[in-house]
A protein has these predicted regions:
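A short, N-terminal amphipathic alpha-helix
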Residues: 71-78
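Conserved catalytic cores of phosphodiester-cleaving nucleases, focusing on short active-site segments
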Residues: 12, 31-57, 61, 69
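Short acidic/glycine-enriched loop/turn segments that link adjacent beta-strands
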Residues: 26-29
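Generic alpha-helical structural signal
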Residues: 6, 70-71
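Domain-level recognition of nuclease-like catalytic cores that cleave nucleotide substrates
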Residues: 79-106
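Short, conserved glycine- and acidic-residue-centered signature motifs
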Residues: 1, 5, 61-66
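Acidic-basic catalytic patches of nuclease active cores, encompassing PD-(D/E)XK
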Residues: 1-22
Length: 106
């Protein structure tokens, strides 16, 4: 897990989420974080930038990334039948310094 993923995980843990998987491989895709809080599963794509010189970290998400994250996330959840019936949501987390900004991917 890289620095940005660790900072994002800390951010989500403070909000009551617990980690189910990090850097989980689903076919040729990778899911940065898969989290759970109550009956909600949250799949998170994490992007990090060290400074402001080259824009915001969330600008690194191209038009195809949400589709890939949704496809991989659905595959990961399907492979875990104990999670059937839970709400599944998808987000991107942009990490800059110690600040984490969250945006929905759906």
């Amino acid at each position: 897990m890289n620095r940005g993923e660790r900072l994002a995980l800390r951010h989500y843990r403070r909000r009551g989420y617990r980690l189910l998987a990090a850097n989980a491989r689903v076919g040729r895709y990778e899911l940065d974080l898969v989290l759970r809080r109550g009956r909600r599963i949250l799949v998170v794509e994490v992007k990090e930038k060290g400074g402001d010189a080259f824009g915001h970290p969330l600008e690194m998400i191209d038009d195809e990334k949400p589709r890939r994250v949704l496809t991989a996330g659905a595959g990961w959840v399907a492979a875990h039948p104990e999670l059937t019936g839970l709400e599944v949501a998808f987000e991107a987390a942009g990490v800059r310094g110690r600040h984490v900004e969250r945006v929905p991917l759906t």
